[in-house]
């Protein structure tokens, strides 16, 4: 920006979007996405940090955002009646946190709490959904990437369930 004006020029705004798009391109979840689509997503993103023990969301609450973790870990948990919160999985650097924002009724399936200090890109879910609806190629790319994450996590859950089910009674 010029020293006499607080309003950025068009060139400066484009540069800011490009820098953010470049930062997004470095995240494994978005690896290989076109620069144009990264710029569209960058416009809906912001850099955020969370301290350890900060609750990002509760299960069954509205899913209005999602995150791409840059550093730190987040624990997914679930409230089990009569037992309290049960840890389900740990999400770390390079991973997507949140997929419920993409599918109606847009409510979190799990809760999430920062297990350590976390740095992430935070996205406005409504904006990203609208942009995906307006650009079917972007929508396909985002949905395909989320589906890949869901498939991986389902397989991980399957392995954990098998491990738990073969343990002798009383060991759990």
Language-model features: locations:
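Cytosolic regulatory regions built on CNB/CRP/Popeye-like sensor folds
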Residues: 1-172
């Amino acid at each position: 920006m010029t020293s006499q004006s607080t309003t950025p020029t068009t060139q400066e705004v484009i540069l800011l979007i490009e820098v953010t798009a470049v930062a997004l391109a470095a995240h494994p979840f978005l690896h290989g996405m076109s620069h144009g689509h990264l710029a569209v997503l960058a416009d809906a993103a912001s850099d955020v940090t969370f301290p350890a023990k900060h609750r990002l969301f509760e299960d069954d609450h509205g899913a209005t955002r999602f995150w791409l973790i840059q550093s730190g870990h987040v624990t997914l948990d679930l409230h089990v009646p009569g037992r309290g919160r049960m840890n389900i999985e740990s999400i770390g650097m390079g991973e997507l946190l949140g997929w419920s924002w993409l599918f109606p009724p847009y409510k979190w399936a799990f809760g999430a709490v920062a297990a350590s200090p976390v740095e992430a890109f935070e996205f406005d879910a409504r904006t990203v959904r609208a942009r995906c609806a307006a650009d079917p190629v972007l929508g396909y790319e985002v949905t395909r990437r989320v589906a890949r994450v869901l498939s991986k996590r389902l397989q991980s859950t399957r392995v954990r369930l098998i491990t738990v089910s073969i343990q002798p009674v009383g060991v759990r």
